Amino acid sequence: MKEYRALLALLHLASPSLPIGAYTYSQGLESAIEQGLVRDETSAREWLVEMLGIFTDFELPILQRLLKAFSERDEAAVSFWTECFVASRETSEFRAETVQMGYSLAKLVIDLKLGDDSMRAILENQQAIPLPTAFACAAEALGIPHEESLLGMLFSMAENQVLACVKSVPLGQLSGQRLLLSLHPVIEACSIRASQLTDDELSSWAPGLSLLSMQHEVQYSRIYRS
């Protein structure tokens, strides 16, 4: 029964209906579509695999460390990795995205009184709360195993990107589901790799994505906030 509760909690946390505004962000994808880099199902899959790789090298290992820090109620470690992640956001849109979503999820954690008082206090004490920090706190509070938490965040990111592709390329619904299904083994492999990276191996190096984000800030016509 405990396992079922953890699964239900994971499905809830990774749900696109979670009111944190994920659907309003494309993480540079809208700019890539505008420039013709993503134009069909094949190029969309190439983009998604590349994005999952970027997540694997930095965001996911940070999440893993935050999960451990929250489980040990280690406020210093939570603050260190939180500040590290916020500092890694190269553009104003990327920083605003993660802080807005993190704030919204943190508010849910606090208002719903998830976890214990000490855990929520650590969350509230952060100057800026990016999404990985809020996600880690929520996952730990809900009793979701760390490995499943990594998979949940990756799948949630991939699903959001696929939905943006379906709306903006545009692609058909069948293409979108085919894309998402094809990413299952990629997500699993990325989760395993992320869990094995040492601190010295973490890297947020993605200059092309940063340039797309900067260009999106001045893009004439857009429907997404990043």
UniProtKB/Swiss-Prot annotation:
InterPro entries tied to this protein: UreF (IPR002639), UreF_sf (IPR038277)
GO cellular component: cytoplasm
Top-level taxon of origin: Bacteria
Cellular compartments annotated: Cytoplasm
GO molecular function: nickel cation binding
Record bears the keyword Chaperone: yes
Pfam assignment, any one: UreF
Key words of the record: Chaperone, Cytoplasm, Nickel insertion
Keyword Zinc: no
TM segment ranges: none
Assigned protein family: Belongs to the UreF family.
Function of the molecule: Required for maturation of urease via the functional incorporation of the urease nickel metallocenter.
Assembly behavior: UreD, UreF and UreG form a complex that acts as a GTP-hydrolysis-dependent molecular chaperone, activating the urease apoprotein by helping to assemble the nickel containing metallocenter of UreC. The UreE protein probably delivers the nickel.
Name of the featured protein: Urease accessory protein UreF
Species the sequence originates in: Nitrosospira multiformis (strain ATCC 25196 / NCIMB 11849 / C 71)
Encoding gene (name): ureF
